[in-house]
């Protein structure tokens, strides 16, 4: 059963989309003159219909029509594409505050709710055979895995029986379905769930997670978050994340989850809600694979080849609870200010993400927008100063507004306009008197943490000669790899390379020095070690030698050795 075998058609008699096998159902497709309407669809709920009504000045009967949305953000109403662009319309919208009030004032009637249920019940009934294949098919895919979710889950559990099964739960529709599938397939409600709370989720995501825990009290549920860092304050220090330098996930999601899971001695079999159709990068994922992101490292993806429409077919068929952000029109649920979000998601966040007595979010869209303007002012101003371009205050203000409006902050890289970027400058020079020796000046005094950073290379041996200390790093054969000479409370160090067989050794050492210079204890490094040897807790960077296997993944994982240093690096002007 391959993706190309299936198509999404419009069933005029029932006024809903149906998923059909192009070969097996060819007679029906021809006899009923069914038209393939989209590569994928999602249902449009009443709340989003209300938004469309206000945005496009539609008639009141929109609430009672069968409305669906394509992956490209095009709406299909009763089988007919709406010939209006939502992106263009929101960009041309006048008086946003008034529009927002109209959207938030919506109240559903019983008649509207009954009609919505009727549409979805027809959708479920007409697609039940397709859902049965998704759940129970024992055909094998090109990887040799069962196509049906239930036999796939059962087989994977049997194959990795010594591992602890776990569901990675994000609060989105895909992980909601995977959670339900796994617990149902195994007839076991006590499957461990872990939620990586980035502290940046949509308000309704938090409400849904609380409902999930309340309704599934037999399911052990871990909420993991970075308690030591504040996203908003980090943005002020190192700039907002961008599509080029998306530092936030490692710091606020995989880092905290890695910290918790590394404390377990068991290895995990993690069930993910990842799907190949979500992005070009995910299209290359395997259904079962190893991952360094989670301690123990095997992940299984039961819905990896499902459409969006398949996910919704399961949710509506099983009548399971889901994140109500989807009702508002969010095509995907995640961090509400993510630089990878679409214009539509950004627009919806501007409507729905605001502080009030009903949520506990750390900051809202208005505060985020104000920050973006102040940050962008520094970036734009510094760019013009560097290039000797003189602007009046009015001209500068205009360029800043354009920078924010066109989302240029999403494409930024480097620490232009940020004081912290100076910490990425490592002053170094080659020693004339000694071969393979370099003198470097740090921006911090050498301390115990400095020594800790070299434990991944091998055994540490320190010799003291008065105020001077010599740090030798030895390999497993007790042979010296390199030597670092420094004085107590000094910022100057001298590095001598002893083992010249590794031509990348000096670069690896520099990576650790970058880490020492710029470390803000963000906890991103916690996710780099699959053996639980590394931990950043309470403002301390620690490595447990008894667990470290000297794989150097913690050294090589991030560009420049440090996620923060990488985010702050400013390209030198040629």
What do the PLM-derived regions correspond to, one by one?
Residues 1-168, 173-447, 452-505, 512, ...:
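Nucleotide-activated chemistry modules centered on ATP-dependent adenylation/adenylyltransferase
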Residues 198, 519, 548:
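Hydrophobic pocket-lining residues within nucleotide cofactor-binding pockets
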Residues 327-330, 535-547, 551:
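Short linker/helix segments within small regulatory modules
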Residues 331-347, 519-525, 551-554, 558:
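Cysteine-cluster motifs in flexible loop/terminal segments that predominantly coordinate metals
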Residues 338, 506-509, 558-565:
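Generic detector of short, aliphatic-rich beta-strand segments that form the cores of beta-sheets
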Residues 512-518:
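Acidic, Ser/Thr/Pro/Gly-enriched interdomain connector segments
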Residues 517, 531-532, 545-546:
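Short, well-ordered coil/turn residues that connect adjacent beta-strands
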């Amino acid at each position: 059963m391959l993706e190309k075998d299936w198509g999404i058609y419009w069933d005029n008699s029932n006024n809903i989309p149906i998923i059909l096998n192009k070969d097996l159902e060819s007679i029906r497709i021809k006899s009923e003159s069914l038209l393939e309407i989209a590569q994928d669809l999602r249902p449009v709920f009443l709340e989003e219909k209300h938004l469309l009504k206000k945005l496009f000045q539609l008639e009141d009967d929109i609430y009672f029509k069968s409305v669906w949305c394509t992956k490209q953000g095009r709406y299909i109403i009763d089988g007919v594409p709406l010939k209006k662009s939502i992106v263009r319309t929101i960009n041309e919208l006048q008086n946003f505050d008034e529009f927002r009030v109209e959207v938030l004032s919506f109240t559903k009637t019983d008649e509207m709710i009954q009609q919505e249920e009727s549409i979805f019940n027809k959708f479920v009934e007409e697609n039940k055979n397709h859902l049965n294949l998704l759940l129970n098919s024992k055909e094998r895919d090109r990887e040799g895995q069962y196509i049906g979710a239930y036999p796939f889950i059962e087989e994977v559990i049997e194959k990795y029986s010594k591992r602890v099964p776990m569901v990675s739960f994000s609060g989105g529709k895909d992980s909601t379905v995977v959670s339900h599938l796994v617990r149902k397939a195994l007839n076991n409600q006590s499957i461990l769930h872990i939620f990586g709370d980035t502290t940046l989720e949509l308000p309704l995501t938090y409400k849904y997670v609380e409902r999930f825990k309340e309704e599934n009290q037999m399911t052990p549920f871990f909420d993991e978050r970075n308690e030591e860092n504040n996203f908003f304050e980090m943005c002020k220090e190192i700039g907002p994340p961008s599509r080029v330098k998306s530092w936030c996930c490692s710091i606020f999601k995989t880092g905290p989850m890695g910290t918790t899971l590394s404390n377990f001695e068991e290895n995990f079999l993690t069930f993910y809600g990842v799907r190949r159709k979500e992005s070009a990068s995910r299209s290359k994922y395997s259904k079962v694979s190893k991952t360094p992101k989670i301690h123990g490292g095997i992940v299984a993806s039961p819905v990896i080849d499902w459409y969006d429409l398949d996910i919704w077919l399961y949710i509506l068929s099983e009548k399971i609870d889901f994140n109500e952000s989807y009702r508002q029109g969010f095509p995907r649920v995640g961090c509400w200010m993510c630089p990878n979000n679409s214009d539509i998601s950004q627009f919806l966040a501007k409507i729905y993400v605001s502080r009030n007595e009903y949520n506990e979010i750390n900051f809202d869209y208005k505060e985020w927008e104000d920050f973006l303007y102040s940050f962008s002012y520094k970036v734009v101003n510094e760019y013009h100063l560097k290039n000797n371009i003189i602007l009046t205050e009015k001209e500068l203000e205009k360029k800043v507004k354009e920078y924010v409006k066109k989302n240029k902050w999403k494409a930024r890289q480097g620490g232009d306009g940020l004081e912290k970027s100076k910490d990425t400058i490592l002053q170094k020079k080659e020693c004339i008197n000694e071969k393979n020796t370099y003198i470097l000046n740090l921006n911090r005094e050498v301390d115990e943490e400095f020594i800790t950073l070299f434990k991944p290379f091998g055994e540490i041996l320190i010799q003291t000669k008065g105020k001077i200390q010599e740090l030798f790093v030895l390999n497993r054969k007790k042979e010296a790899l390199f030597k670092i000479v420094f004085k107590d409370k000094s910022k100057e160090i001298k590095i001598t390379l002893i083992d010249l067989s590794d031509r990348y050794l000096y670069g690896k050492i520099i990576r650790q020095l970058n880490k020492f210079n710029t470390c803000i204890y963000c906890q991103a490094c916690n996710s780099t070690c699959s053996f639980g040897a590394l931990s950043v807790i309470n403002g301390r960077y620690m490595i447990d030698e008894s667990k470290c296997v000297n794989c150097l993944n913690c050294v090589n994982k991030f560009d420049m050795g440090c996620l923060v240093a990488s985010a702050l690096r400013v390209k030198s002007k040629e």
